[in-house]
């Protein structure tokens, strides 16, 4: 009887270097063709039976496939823990997986690094340190980064540029370590655009916008991420006009090509300043660069047009979006609510529930929009219903913003007993916004006694804001109690309180002009007032 020979007969041939190489190639190919975890387990079993479970090369392949394709970190760790003498590449494979799943696996990454240090063989190198330094900003201990810093200094790897940059990024990611980050930055033997951007982002994160801008201006070269970092810094710190100005500079740089992050940052600034014409130009720019289809850009456009009052354009962008995220739905609901179109806001929510009930669930922002819509529309019953829906059906714990909306809704409707009852059930203390909305409601309905209680609490929360006492003085005047009105006015003077000045913006030729009440610092004040007087005289 003849012997049956298969295409895999060489797998059971006598051991040789060539046979082992062929076997390694075969198993490597099988790993790359695997589709799920059971396949991988079969391959691992075959490696054990074939005496190849000690192969660093194949174990590395298993780990990479398990983490990158299957995203199964627990089984990857299972594979690693059964390897007798792991090398640096295997440690790096697991650390890469942990550092790619931050902040979820930050503590696992740091513990794994400490395991490697305690074993002493192999020692961490310039590949390992940057990986563990990614995790340290997410740890609760403020000493994690300095601990790694001390260890890498002793090992001599602190001189590697890639390690220095990772260390800088780790320090700069923590507000408490920003001084150490700057010290390290100044001592770096070689600074590249990545290290400059890391330091810039650190200043932005700590709110030190002046140092962030100064550093940006000193940069010898700038790339798109560094431009995006300074744009985000300005936007996040309320310098919206400066962000718009920087964007204009950016698009005039011949070697710089703005991306989706750029557009999102500048659209956010435009939304806050109300620069609709400039925003339309940015929308056209994004369309020409094929960026408008990006889900984050699309969401930003909906938010922008909604805040600027162009709800038709916001609806158009929303409807054209190929994939509508929860952020887009929330933006649309909040846009309609902001402009008093309550029924349309509610209709968007009902559509979201009907089309996406299994894919997208509303969050706390959704219900803030709905409650605001009910407030502007005076829909008390619906507002109460949505508040109950949020807690009972979707299990969302009410935040102070939700309570504020509901109390505002009840107060505007003159249902003060119900508003006070809601306040008594809150797990947190009422803030300035809640007492302020209650004071406004008292002014509408002439509820003097409760207004006095509201002002007392508002003054305790913010003694420097004289606007609340001024409102109370006006309410006393409207009620004919001039003595109390005079007393309230004197209180403002004695407490050195101030009333925040009103302001407005106007956009002319893509340039924003901002005016404050009684402010005459504008260089063209005389001409502006002359035109204003001529308009009033008509």
UniProtKB/Swiss-Prot annotation:
One of its GO terms (molecular function) is RNA binding. Residues 434-509 are annotated as: Type E motif. The keyword Repeat applies. PROSITE patterns: PPR (PS51375). Pfam families: E_motif, PPR, PPR_2. Gene3D superfamilies: Tetratricopeptide repeat domain. The keyword Ligase does not apply. PPR repeats lie at residues 87-123, 125-159, 160-191, 192-226, 227-253, 259-293, 294-324, 325-359, 363-398, 399-433. SUPFAM superfamilies: TPR-like. InterPro entries: E_motif, Pentatricopeptide_rpt, PPR_At4g14850-like_plant, TPR-like_helical_dom_sf. Keywords: Repeat. One of its GO terms (biological process) is RNA modification. PANTHER family: PENTATRICOPEPTIDE REPEAT (PPR) SUPERFAMILY PROTEIN, PENTATRICOPEPTIDE REPEAT-CONTAINING PROTEIN. Belongs to the PPR family. PCMP-E subfamily. This is Pentatricopeptide repeat-containing protein At1g33350.
């Amino acid at each position: 009887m003849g012997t049956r020979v298969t295409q895999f007969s060489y797998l059971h041939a006598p051991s040789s270097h060539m046979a082992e190489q062929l076997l390694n190639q075969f198993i490597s190919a099988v790993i790359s063709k695997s589709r799920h975890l059971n396949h991988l387990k079969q391959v691992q079993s075959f490696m054990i039976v074939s005496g190849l479970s000690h192969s660093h090369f194949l174990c590395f392949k298993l780990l990479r496939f398990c983490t990158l394709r299957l995203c199964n970190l627990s089984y990857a760790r299972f594979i690693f823990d059964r390897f007798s003498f792991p090398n640096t590449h295997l440690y790096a494979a697991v650390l890469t997986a942990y550092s790619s799943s931050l902040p979820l696996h930050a503590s696992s990454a740091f513990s794994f690094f400490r395991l490697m240090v305690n074993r002493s063989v192999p020692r961490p190198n310039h590949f390992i340190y940057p990986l563990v330094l990614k995790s340290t900003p997410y740890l609760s201990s403020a000493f994690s980064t300095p601990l790694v810093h001390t260890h890498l200094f002793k090992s001599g790897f602190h001189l590697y540029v890639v390690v220095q940059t990772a260390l800088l990024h780790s320090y700069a990611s923590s507000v408490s370590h920003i001084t150490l980050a700057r010290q390290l930055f100044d001592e770096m033997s070689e600074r590249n655009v990545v290290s400059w951007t890391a330091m810039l982002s650190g200043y932005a994160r700590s709110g030190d916008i002046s140092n962030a801008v100064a550093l940006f201006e000193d940069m010898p070269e700038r790339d798109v991420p560094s431009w995006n970092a300074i744009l985000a810094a300005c936007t996040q710190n309320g310098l919206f006009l400066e962000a718009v100005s920087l964007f204009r500079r950016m698009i005039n740089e011949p070697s710089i090509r703005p991306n989706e992050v750029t557009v999102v940052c500048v659209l956010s600034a435009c939304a806050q300043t109300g620069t609709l014409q400039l925003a339309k130009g940015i929308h056209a720019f994004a369309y020409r660069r094929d960026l408008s289809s990006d889900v984050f850009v699309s969401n930003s456009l909906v938010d922008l047009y909604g805040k600027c009052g162009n709800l038709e354009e916001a609806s158009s962008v929303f409807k054209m979006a190929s994939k509508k995220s929860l952020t887009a739905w929330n933006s649309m609901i909040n846009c309609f609510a902001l402009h008093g179109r309550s029924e349309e806001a509610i209709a968007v929510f009902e559509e979201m529930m009907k089309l996406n009930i299994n894919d997208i669930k509303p969050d706390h922002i959704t219900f803030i929009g709905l409650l605001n819509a009910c407030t502007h529309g005076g829909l008390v019953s619906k507002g109460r219903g949505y508040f109950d829906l949020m807690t009972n059906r979707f299990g969302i714990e009410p935040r102070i913003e939700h309570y504020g909306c509901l109390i505002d809704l009840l107060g505007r409707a003159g249902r003060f007993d119900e508003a006070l009852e809601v306040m008594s059930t809150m797990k947190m203390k009422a803030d300035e916004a809640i007492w302020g909305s209650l004071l406004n409601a008292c002014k509408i309905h002439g509820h003097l006694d409760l207004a006095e209680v509201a002002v007392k609490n508002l003054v305790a929360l913010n003694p420097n804001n004289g606007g609340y006492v001024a409102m109370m003085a006006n309410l006393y005047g409207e009620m004919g109690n001039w003595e109390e009105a005079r007393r309230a006015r004197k209180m403002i003077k004695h407490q050195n309180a101030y009333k925040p000045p009103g302001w407005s913006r106007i956009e002319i030729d893509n340039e924003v002009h901002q005016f404050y009440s009684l402010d005459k610092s504008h260089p063209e004040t005389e001409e502006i007032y002359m035109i204003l007087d001529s308009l009033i005289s008509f």
